[in-house]
From Swiss-Prot:
Pathway involvement of the protein, from the record: Carbohydrate degradation; L-rhamnose degradation; glycerone phosphate from L-rhamnose: step 2/3
Gene3D superfamilies: 3.30.420.40
Residues of the active site: 232
Protein name: Rhamnulokinase
HAMAP family: Rhamnulokinase
Intrachain S-S bonds: 348-365, 408-412
Length: 485
């Protein structure tokens, strides 16, 4: 089986082999590539052709090795989309969700439609780049494009289409758009109308597990392409070996997404006030979670400072005084500033914290601030669910940052398990195995993951630094500019 896992910063083609008798699961990286952003006519767009080419090269490599493939699945980030004309050809380039075209659009939508009405219909967190606001911006700023559009596909649906020639709309990713009605599981006609787009661009999203079509290889293979849980976090959570019903997960990467699984969505006033999202998951479950800006801040800072040795930077940051400088990572100023280091410094200066000047000071500021925000979100989630979080499972690339994860354990006062690193890839494979009938369900698959990919564990330290600075951070996190409220 092949899992094509596309994150916001990079993509990978991974080969998985499963041996049912021993319930052994192995992964092999076929290729890894950077997901590039280009600037075209003043807009930041994804180089979707380069992404597709990298995928095809990975598949061709496996085909040339003579490996018989059972299935293929693609997962990616949410909200971004591709427009197709009546001939199935792409119209323009998919715009990057951090592009500035949506500035002010969400606030106008909340004023016109009412925040309560939008949240009640969708149960989705208010994020300025949600597809709802991207489409409203498109219809306002480039209405001439709309007449030629026949279909809108989210990124993994588009890439599945390119491999198979078949259209598909998958539920878990569709749920991120803030266009899906949480009661019906179908596109909300009133929200589509506000976005300025017709319903015939879409079909009702299907749950993960169906075969979309087939990829035909140069050597004559006809490989089923499966609609996995195509939102990367939905796949990551599918593979998270949660120890009990009260455990929470933290999918840690460019974004940090902290939440828990629920059989029903939480769309009451308290959930809305906490800006909690109810995204679709596997087996009809809901991912009740909150988006946190995550390692995006560190990625941008290290790019600007041209730092390649991340382990050394983390080691240097660990030697800095704790909580010397704090920011609110979910402040909207950090979505896509021209210069991240300068923006962090300005935020510290404005709130009378010492200004971090060195790379180590900047990194420590980011790590301490993320740990504080993790604590705040964990408390919000526990309050919403009505019982404490028993354990936190950190999955994804960020689970390799043991220093940050120890800060998270300390700040939250929780035992933490780290792994698997390739959680989205493994969740993608899990959907395929369930679809192929090789694995019974998500619970069964999580046992397989836990047995094949050992976890690492951390316990919280008695850390007075966080307690001493908690009130300072709370004052930051209550500022009205917090991300998307």
């Amino acid at each position: 089986m092949v899992a094509i896992d596309l994150g916001a910063s990079s993509g990978r083609v991974m080969l998985a082999s499963y041996y049912p008798g021993q319930q052994q699961l192995t992964l092999r990286e076929v290729c890894r590539f950077t997901n590039q952003i280009k600037s075209i006519d003043g807009s930041d767009v994804w180089d979707i052709d380069a992404i597709e080419q990298s995928i095809r090269e990975g598949l061709s490599q496996l085909d040339s090795e003579g490996i018989a493939l059972d299935s293929i699945g693609i997962d990616s980030w949410g909200v971004d989309f591709v427009l197709l004309d009546k001939q199935g050809k792409r119209i323009g380039q998919p715009v990057y969700y951090r592009d500035s075209r949506t500035q002010g659009v969400m606030a106008r939508a909340q004023q016109t439609l009412g925040s309560n009405a939008i949240y009640r219909r969708t149960g989705i967190q208010f994020l300025p780049f949600n597809t709802l606001y991207q489409l409203r911006a498109l219809s306002e700023q480039q209405p001439h494009l709309l007449a030629d559009v026949a279909h809108l596909l989210l990124i993994p649906d588009y890439l599945h289409y390119r491999l198979t020639g078949q259209l598909n709309w998958e539920y878990t990713n569709a749920s991120t758009t803030q266009l899906l009605n949480i009661e019906t599981g179908d596109w909300d006609s009133d929200l589509l109308a506000y976005a300025g787009v017709p319903a015939h661009w879409f079909a009702k999203p299907g749950k993960p597990g169906n075969t979309i079509g087939y990829w035909h290889s140069a050597n004559g293979q006809q490989v089923p392409v499966v609609a996995v849980a195509t939102h990367d976090t939905a796949s990551a959570v599918l593979a998270a070996p949660l120890i009990d019903a009260d455990a929470a997960y933290l999918s840690s990467g460019t974004w940090s997404l902290m939440g828990f699984e629920s059989g029903t969505p939480l769309t009451h006033q308290q959930a809305q006030c906490s800006n909690i999202t109810n995204e679709g998951g596997a087996e009809g479950r809901y991912r009740v979670l909150k988006n946190i800006m995550g390692l995006w801040l560190l990625q941008r800072a290290t790019d600007e400072l041209q730092i390649d040795d991340l382990p050394q930077l983390i080691e240097q940051a660990a030697r800095q005084p704790a909580c010397r400088s704090l920011i609110n990572p979910n402040d909207s100023r950090f979505i896509n500033p021209p210069n991240m280091c300068r923006e962090i410094q300005n935020a510290c200066r404005e709130h009378q914290f010492p200004v971090p000047n060195t790379a180590a000071q900047l990194a420590r500021c980011i790590f301490d601030s993320l740990a504080m925000l993790y604590r705040q979100v964990a408390q919000e989630l526990a309050t919403l669910r009505g019982r404490p979080i028993s354990h936190l499972h950190i999955v994804g690339g960020g689970c390799q940052n043991q220093f940050l994860n120890q800060l998270c354990a300390d700040a939250c006062g929780l035992n933490v398990s780290m792994g698997p690193v390739e959680a989205s890839t493994l969740g993608n494979i899990g959907s395929q195995l369930i679809s192929l009938g090789e694995v019974a369900d998500v619970t069964h698959y999580r046992r397989i993951v836990a047995n094949n990919f050992p976890l690492h564990h951390l316990s919280p330290h008695d850390n007075s630094d966080f307690a001493a600075h908690w009130l300072q951070f709370q004052s930051l996190s209550q500022l009205p500019k917090e991300l998307c409220i």
